[in-house]
Amino acid sequence: MAKFEGYSEKQKSHQQYFVYPLLFQEYIYAFAHDYVLNGSEPVEIFGCNTKKFSSLLVKRLIIRMYQQNFWINSVNHPNQDRLLDHSNHFYSEFYSQILSEGFAIVVEIPFSLGQLSCPEEKEIPKFQNLRSIHSIFPFLEDKFLHLHYLSHIEIPYPIHFEILVQLLEYRIQDVPSLHLLRFFLNYYSNWNSLITSMKSIFLLKKENKRLSRFLYNSYVSEYEFFLLFLRKQSSCLRLTSSRTFLERIHFSRKMEHFGVMYPGFFRKTIWFFMDPLMHYVRYQRKVILASKGTLLLKKKWKSYLVNFSQYFFSFWTQPQRIRLNQLTNSCFDFLGYRSNVPINTFLVRNQMLENFILIDTRMKKFDTTAPGTPLIGSLAKAQFCTGSGHPISKPIWTDLSDWDILDRFGRICRNLFHYHSGSSKKQTLYRLKYILRLSCARTLARKHKSTVRTFMQRLGSVFLEEFFTEEEQVFSLMFAKTTHFSFHGSHSERIWYLDIIRIDDLVNPLTLN
């Protein structure tokens, strides 16, 4: 316990931040509006034009916030469907959204200041390529070949919203901000039942995605903080310096409560999980723990994680959410790829001194493929095909111009090929390409009230083929002088791009299931 208190003491912040007064500054809401416009996922305010920022409405909001009965009416009428202005639906929803977006920016300020003041950050080199999602797979390919067991973990969520508020108390000490956060959570819990009757936050409305992400990141960082501490204590090697997202000042007090609920659990933890070859990878709620240890050790980790969630977060974790598998006998889905380590090894021949010395080495292979059935299911959900993969037209796009229709279908196809370029088997991608191409042709034929055959004869299939294979032709020119590279002739080349920083829209639902 003393070691943990010392570790927790290093992480805590001695400076208090009072951010509530910033909510009365007009520029905060201008920043929130700019984030909505420049973000990768735009937000619509109930059909109104988000490109217009009304400073007059913001000034009215600030004036209302100075009034004494501003929050009292809302608190005394929690079952009302509208906030701030019950007589006008537009103003009510505009005020609630712009206020929640501004609040999300304000509460992020202490964490940003803490990162800027961290002396260790200057010693850590900045590698922009590490932001890429594809940078995870070379790491898996390098490390997982030597490991034995794999644990699939789903981080328990939702949890009681009061726990989320308590997590922020370690960095935000002004009481009004915490009460305002409670107000938002209660407000959205009564609006369309976005939070369950048990008052556990699951998903905020998409209009408040920034606040939802901030709360979720705070929760996940707390979840990972203790795992990082155990990893440092159980490892025989010094870990690379890393900084957690959330610092805390009363973390040891929670651990004392944790120890009372489960006597002796913490004291045995250090030697209980000694494993110098433990690797941890997470994206969103999906977590992978890989180890070279025994099956008994992995079962101990599973037991620990279940009890940790129950006694520390007051959340019951279903044991079936943590699955144990042997790497050589199973495959796992991660970031839209289906990965496994086949039992059969492949031969690598090395030659030295002009073929005088030949060395044959048997090596394992980390195989990654694009899952066909889930991707076809995503296309079916987006109404590009049926559940069995039969292409259909896209009626809602028939009002667009021919070029816009071709551009949308072509962009979707290129994005799929680009994201799944690391797949060792391209047959699935070519099937998806066929579905999108025929769906595009049927959409254009439906727009012009013609048959697909008649439309294709008039337009010609060459244009569609060149449109969809533009990226393939570029790669064939790039690799023409060095290797016999062809998307159509080979299905085993894998390319990991370091410019992909977000999951494709059709792939993202697969990562949440």
From Swiss-Prot:
Primary localisation category: plastid
GO terms for cellular component: chloroplast
Keywords, comma-separated and alphabetical: Chloroplast, mRNA processing, Plastid, RNA-binding, tRNA processing
Record's subcellular location: Plastid, Chloroplast
Record's keyword annotation contains Endoplasmic reticulum: no
InterPro entries: Domain_X, Maturase_MatK, Maturase_MatK_N
GO molecular function, one term: RNA binding
One BP annotation, GO: mRNA processing
Family to which the UniProt record says this protein belongs: Belongs to the intron maturase 2 family. MatK subfamily.
Function recorded in the entry: Usually encoded in the trnK tRNA gene intron. Probably assists in splicing its own and other chloroplast group II introns.
Name of the featured protein: Maturase K
Biological source species: Cynodon dactylon
